[in-house]
Amino acid sequence: MNTRLEKFYKENVVPALMKEFGYTNPMEVPKLVKVTLNMGVGEAASNKKILENAVADMSKISGQKPVVTKSRVSVASFKIRDGWPIGCKTTLRRAKMYEFLDRLINISLPRVRDFRGVSGRSFDGRGNFNMGVKEQIIFPEIDFDAVDAIRGMDIAVTTTAKTDAEAKALLAAFKFPFRN
């Protein structure tokens, strides 16, 4: 079963990118590999309930249970010790990845206050895109009244593109709202 965005990729994005970059084979066209969501919750060291709420929020947003991340080293200034839970992350692939990106592009990003588009310079040099979200309440799955605290998250989109130009063209073909 193909999602709406996956069908759009096969019917519209692949032919457009083949024409733009001169690919001879459809398998050469860059594609999305995975979307990784990460939520760092530094306050979780002092209060375990905060981490439980963050995990619940992320599981609603992603549709799957996130993994709790633990600190690797003790840092006295942050008051954390080695092995303490300090965040959560989840990796979306295939259908869940396309469904999440569809919701992100068409529903969540337009709900951001004073939104002018995502930065076109957030590529890592190898064709992957990273962005941050300041509030988890932009996602429709989160009930605004039930939120205990406003938390942000990192979103990393991994592609098979070899250059940033190919990756930007791929995401722009998916109607990603780039600022520049």
Swiss-Prot record:
Keyword Iron recorded: no
GO cellular component: ribonucleoprotein complex; ribosome
GO molecular function, one term: tRNA binding
InterPro entries, per the entry: Ribosomal_uL5, Ribosomal_uL5_bac-type, Ribosomal_uL5_C, Ribosomal_uL5_CS, Ribosomal_uL5_dom_sf, Ribosomal_uL5_N
GO biological process, one term: translation
Pfam families: Ribosomal_L5 (PF00281), Ribosomal_L5_C (PF00673)
UniProt keyword list: Ribonucleoprotein, Ribosomal protein, RNA-binding, rRNA-binding, tRNA-binding
PROSITE patterns to which the protein is assigned, alphabetical: RIBOSOMAL_L5
Record's function text: This is one of the proteins that bind and probably mediate the attachment of the 5S RNA into the large ribosomal subunit, where it forms part of the central protuberance. In the 70S ribosome it contacts protein S13 of the 30S subunit (bridge B1b), connecting the 2 subunits; this bridge is implicated in subunit movement. Contacts the P site tRNA; the 5S rRNA and some of its associated proteins might help stabilize positioning of ribosome-bound tRNAs.
Summary of subunit composition and partner proteins: Part of the 50S ribosomal subunit; part of the 5S rRNA/L5/L18/L25 subcomplex. Contacts the 5S rRNA and the P site tRNA. Forms a bridge to the 30S subunit in the 70S ribosome.
Family: Belongs to the universal ribosomal protein uL5 family.
Protein name as annotated: Large ribosomal subunit protein uL5
Organism ancestry: Bacteria, Pseudomonadati, Pseudomonadota, Gammaproteobacteria, Lysobacterales
